[in-house]
Amino acid sequence: MQCLFLEERIKKEGCVVLFAEAFRPSFANIQGFLTTIAEPVSRLSLMHEYRMTYFSLGAAASASISVSEVIQFLDDHVYFFRDKCFASYRESVCAFAEMYMSRCNLARVVIDESRTLLECKDIVTAKTLLKDRVVRSLCCQPKETVGEDACPHFLLKSRAAARVVAERCVLLGYPLQQQYEYEKDTSIRNVNIALKSQTRPRPYQIAAVDAAASDGALRSGCIVLPCGSGKTLVGIMLLCKVKKPTLILCAGGVSVEQWRNQILEFASVCAPANNEEGDPSNSTTGEKVRTAAVGAARISCLTGKQKDEITDETDIVLTTYSMLVTAHKAQARCQVEGFEMNADGRGRNPRRANPKERLFQPYGLLIMDEVHMMPADAYKDSLGFINAKGVVGLTATYVREDSKIRDLFHLVGPKLFDISWERLASSGYLAHVTCIEVLTPLARRFSLEYLERSSELTSPQHGTPLLVMLAAANPNKMLCVMEIVKRHVAESSKILVFCDHIMLLKEYSKLLGAPVVCGDTPHRERLMIFSDFQSTSKVNVVCLSRVGDVSVNLPSANVVVQVSSHGGSRRQEAQRLGRILRPKEKASNGKPTDAWFYTVISTDTVEMSYAAHRTAFLVDQGYTCSVTEFNPDGAPEAAVEGVDDTAPGDVVSIRQAKLRGTFKKQELKCSVASPTAQGSVNPRSLDYQEKLLCRVVASWELDYQNATSQQNEPGVANDTATGLIDKKMKRARDETAEDIKREWNSGAQTTQPRGDFCRLPLQRLVGANDDVVYHES
């Protein structure tokens, strides 16, 4: 049955747009194939939008889907596609699919023990690639093809050259396929790892693993699953299926710890079945042989605070992206100094062995958690030095604010599996989330300062770091957050408060009496806070910085309050929403407990445009978002003292219904006339507002001085300039709000801010920059 509409945009945008009627019964039968050949753009409740692009067709070809199957699918399910009046459109779409899919999988990278080969399916493809100057320069001498029979191939200079060749081949229109036949590989030892009998994978997790590994072969690529859907278990299932030494890259130290714990929870890691390591029968001298390591002893973790030794018995290595870059730089530095980094630490210059040196030993499998981080310039250069035959990336946010997300096609591989939040939520695997934008007016003093700073801008940009911080520090936001937290604490909710500015994060900690978790929080203290939050009622609210965006496993959390964010980053929005997507315990009437996601926005500020960009992304993913206004000066609402005994249902359901009714109103008011906070924080106090404003402006001025001092004036010595800056910074710390206002008012009349600073693009100042990764090593 037909349920698709097609729009041809090949000449304008280089794609074919497909609109799907999601309400049709036949749509469920074709959604899997449609997601394979086209990239999902918008998934509303009734209509979905997909785009057939060069990359999606390449992914389809790598999944062994032919051009004829794609055309037959369009003939069967697109309205009017075979009508004579649309014959020209059909020919254009068929030619588009034929042109790209016919070139896919014509070449692949093959890695054996000592060589890196580029293998082609025919001699014509091999000769075409060798004509390119870049590809030819990366080949060993001689550059002629070897074995001009069924599979001609030629040698590459190094493993790192394979990444450059892969990128170049994509530009030439010959995307490479990387396939690893792990069952036939004898150059890398097998590991004895298997899922425990009590582990019960979900159907979509099994489908994701089968999409990557089947029939003894592993296809390199990316698996996209929503936050909270069990990506870590998918990675563990791949470990158990491939059964080869594996390197796992994580976002940070907490993520490494969580991966290690879940591997030990869901899988059994044992010594080789034939007991090659430590079998007494293998000893001919009668000496006592050490027993082979099992379990956690076969897992090594390398982070900034934990550096386990990587031995011959190590089956799994867990490390961070930052540690990978550090090891890569150390290896390059040692090579420049004139000796190679051997595993035993011996070279022409004797030195102590470093555990990081063995990160680049041969692996059968490389798993990259949060793979959307890999296209960053700081990381992708190090990827080429990892000697792994199969690569799989895991992510919940296959999106970046720049165009680098496309680089994953040649860095890792095509998208292998993708499933929407809506499908998992309807099946009960994820929680139903209520997304609410709360519009909060700026406090009077902050509003005047915001208008004054806005008028001083000399470039046509929409904001500066100071404007963003003024909007985030809005005291009325504090009142709003207090009100939201108060209502949910009364329902025994677990609440996460996100704020990107550390100074403001500490203010919210004082305001709510909640612990802070940021980059400076010690690892042990962080784990204790998360443990108390997860399993006790001692901690119900935690204030988090950007370190909580990824790899924080808190299934009990069901409320997120977002005070400030990283510009319009859609990735960050989805990741923070993912903290509460895990399914919650049901009430006694069988209904699931709701999850709540609040974004508190200062009206008439730059936050409005950023929030619109992020919310549009959530709507495209199928979430329902509503808007309410917070009135800090409105008449207080009557407090709810108890539960209506006449209402049907249990206490939890009634309270959830009352919360939904409260936030469906167009205006949210304080439940008490003058809410009081713990400690010295009182957002209604004019004295507190003045001090907070002073600190915000002074903090920005220090950042301004640091930014402008990087370019010294001509003729001024570095040490002199540094001394002047130190004096200015010391003076800025001692200034009051009146001093700062006087200085800026006088400066605005005589001179304008430095042109080079003002001409910085908005993307670099306050926009979302996905090359900046906020986590600890």
From Swiss-Prot:
Disruption phenotype annotation: Mutants are much less tolerant than wild-type cells to UV light- and cisplatin-induced DNA damage.
Domain Helicase C-terminal span(s) in chain numbering: 484-631
Keywords from the named record: ATP-binding, DNA damage, DNA repair, Helicase, Hydrolase, Isomerase, Nucleotide-binding
Record-linked SMART domains: DEXDc (SM00487), HELICc (SM00490)
UniProt similarity note: Belongs to the helicase family. RAD25/XPB subfamily.
Domain of life (superkingdom): Eukaryota
Catalysed reactions, as listed in the record: Couples ATP hydrolysis with the unwinding of duplex DNA by translocating in the 3'-5' direction; ATP + H2O = ADP + phosphate + H(+)
Motif DEVH box location, chain numbering: 369-372
Protein function: ATP-dependent 3'-5' DNA helicase/translocase; binds dsDNA rather than ssDNA, unzipping it in a translocase rather than classical helicase activity. Involved in nucleotide excision repair (NER) of damaged DNA. XPB-R is a paralog of XBP, but is not a component of the TFIIH basal transcription factor and is dispensable for RNA polymerase II transcription.
All residue ranges annotated as the Helicase ATP-binding domain in the record: 212-416
Cellular component GO terms held in the UniProt record: cytoplasm; nucleotide-excision repair factor 3 complex; nucleus; transcription factor TFIIH holo complex; transcription preinitiation complex
GO molecular function: 3'-5' DNA helicase activity; ATP binding; ATP hydrolysis activity; damaged DNA binding
Listed name of the protein: DNA repair helicase/translocase XPB-R
Enzyme nomenclature, EC number: 5.6.2.4
Residues reported in the UniProt entry to bind ATP: L225, P226, C227, G228, S229, G230, K231, T232
Gene3D superfamilies given in the database record: P-loop containing nucleotide triphosphate hydrolases
InterPro entries in alphabetical order: ATP-dep_DNA_Helicase, ERCC3_RAD25_C, Helicase/UvrB_N, Helicase_ATP-bd, Helicase_C-like, P-loop_NTPase, XPB/Ssl2_N
GO biological process terms, semicolon-separated: DNA repair; DNA-templated transcription; transcription initiation at RNA polymerase II promoter
Keyword flag DNA repair: yes
